[in-house]
Amino acid sequence: MAAQGFLLIATFLLVLMVLARPLGSGLARLINDIPLPGTTGVERVLFRALGVSDREMNWKQYLCAILGLNMLGLAVLFFMLLGQHYLPLNPQQLPGLSWDLALNTAVSFVTNTNWQSYSGETTLSYFSQMAGLTVQNFLSAASGIAVIFALIRAFTRQSMSTLGNAWVDLLRITLWVLVPVALLIALFFIQQGALQNFQPYQAVNTVEGAQQLLPMGPVASQEAIKMLGTNGGGFFNANSSHPFENPTALTNFVQMLAIFLIPTALCFAFGEVTGDRRQGRMLLWAMSVIFVICVGVVMWAEVQGNPHLLALGADSSINMEGKESRFGVLVSSLFAVVTTAASCGAVIAMHDSFTALGGMVPMWLMQIGEVVFGGVGSGLYGMMLFVLLAVFIAGLMIGRTPEYLGKKIDVREMKLTALAILVTPTLVLMGAALAMMTDAGRSAMLNPGPHGFSEVLYAVSSAANNNGSAFAGLSANSPFWNCLLAFCMFVGRFGVIIPVMAIAGSLVSKKSQPASSGTLPTHGPLFVGLLIGTVLLVGALTFIPALALGPVAEYLS
């Protein structure tokens, strides 16, 4: 079993690096404002038709463009969900959503979280899924990538005030990265057996002679961007464990690759744009080390079996509860870590049925800020915050002004970095406390004791860090939970983007200082260790008390 797990992890990472390297080169061209070959004419026509100026923006203008687009998308999606019964492509005549569920869902998909307090096949029409949710899957992913584009430019430009043009970046990211790659993935999914139609639900006779209603819909097209954009919201309630979304072992492997593809490519692009590929490799090493350790822990925990079943004398050599037999324990464990290391949240197994330690690792990966590969764009700019913090700590230890890539890190940058890092832990801890203090929060718990608290902590961690996966034992479709989680998702997304853009605006105005004998190398194994230590230290100090009340207490009981 150990050899199979090692081979699975090694194969996954090898294929991932091979695919991400060329994509990283393409992203580097876009960051450097170099159009891809053959696209200049198309871009010129589109910019003219849309009235888009390619004049560069300062950080405030860039931020306002990103926020404006997302707020417009939020309003449109909210009213679309409220009135979906008036809109076309609704063969099942599904009614509009309640205001609190519509708000939660709209915020969820605009913030790239894709938390779902509903069952897709019984709640949303084809139009809502396709024109509402799928469109936001593209736009939220493009928004995250655009923010990291601006931050990377801040490190490479000197004595400037502009960071690029948000509209140009958003169009290029969508047209030349997200749409083509998602199209290829969708076609592969269709070839493998994923659904893509607009037929009404089909009544069929089962082998037992009973009738069953099979849901239909344009699944493959949404599934592709759901994974590529690290969105994670499933067309069906069972998400990627549903055979209509994820029919074969090949589609499952491609789904995992798609989740990590752009976050990995952005690390390669970062190295190319900064002129030092070792910087990108440093980030990849730090992410990969944490990732491999976490996968190993989850695999080990799940192959030990369920201790509660073992205590009752039942056969539980491995923990297969809540897992698809066609994928098994090892693949389910890998997928769980991939989807929570990135801000995806898609699942092929029920995380609520994992062992105490097996479920704690995905929860902790979210709590440290989704920086181990992370979401498209958001993962890298989240990790860059920890890089700045690590550089600052190292500067204090050696008595020098901290600097990174030649840019001095001053008080303003550190205040903004601390603010951005503290946003999500504050939301998680205060949100979980509020839920446990109120009857409306506690009444949603379907399990008592430490596991019930773990369900609450997982839900708030998932929402605040824009992941979207869940311990499904929590009944979250209530006004209290819909509003609480919507607030956490909104602030967790934009409460980090705003200080990140402010950091970019501050750094882009500075000159780059040449490296000296006293400059801390930020590309070697020493800094990789320092960066990993910073991530672990912040995560441990912040969440150990809460984790001790949940999964740790459950493991020890």
Curated annotation (Swiss-Prot):
One of its GO terms (molecular function) is P-type potassium transmembrane transporter activity. GO terms for cellular component: plasma membrane. It is a multi-pass membrane protein. Pfam families: KdpA. Keywords: Cell inner membrane, Cell membrane, Ion transport, Membrane, Potassium, Potassium transport, Transmembrane, Transmembrane helix, Transport. It is found in: Cell inner membrane. The chain crosses the membrane at residues 5-25, 63-83, 132-152, 170-190, 253-273, 283-303, 329-349, 356-376, 379-399, 416-436, 484-504, 526-546. InterPro entries: KdpA (IPR004623). HAMAP family: KdpA. Part of the high-affinity ATP-driven potassium transport (or Kdp) system, which catalyzes the hydrolysis of ATP coupled with the electrogenic transport of potassium into the cytoplasm. This subunit binds the periplasmic potassium ions and delivers the ions to the membrane domain of KdpB through an intramembrane tunnel. Belongs to the KdpA family. The system is composed of three essential subunits: KdpA, KdpB and KdpC. This is Potassium-transporting ATPase potassium-binding subunit. The gene is kdpA.
